[in-house]
Amino acid sequence: CWRRLPAAGVRLHCPAKVETLAQDASGVRVGLDDGLVLEARLAIAADGGHSALRRLARIEAPVHDYHQRGLVAFVATEAPHRDACWQRFLPTGPVALLPFNDDGDAQLHGHLGSIVWTLPETEAQRLLDAPQAQFERELSAAFGGELGGFTLQSQRAAFPLRRQLAQRQVEGRVLLVGDAAHVMHPLAGQGVNHGLPDVSALRA
């Protein structure tokens, strides 16, 4: 949790946005929107697919659009998910359930988890607009009924699915990690699986 960072000697500056970047042989200077200028030996860009540091470092990152959207929501299942990830591969794309701790108290709130449902853009919009009961029925059917009924616990949202690879991960004293370096399809959580080696390389 980010709240533990100060105890590890990490200084937090938030909320803040990066506005300027300058670097030379001795170090890098990052200017924030509140006027503060941070100086360091390296700037690690871990600021996501729309990385401001990547843009300021003039590193190109071409985008390939899958013309799909990832529909996400917080849900409760009627049947226990047994603290296991569930995934089904459908003609329209995979649907996955990522479990939260299953304490078995289904009478209180059901068995909680979050879904990521990969869909063509028009189908995703249809399900975003569908009445809640209809969406829940279609979601249950997408999982083959194995988890029983589904009950929405949040609003539905969707994000575009794209592949984006930075042309290089290092520019002088700026290093890209995680989604700032590579954005990929959420299938099987490969985004985080590729981000962790970036962090390991920093420690080497």
Model region roles, listed by residue range:
Residues C1-L56, P62-R69:
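Conserved N-terminal helical subregion
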Residues R29, A43-A157:
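Conserved FAD-binding catalytic core of PHBH/FMO-like flavoproteins
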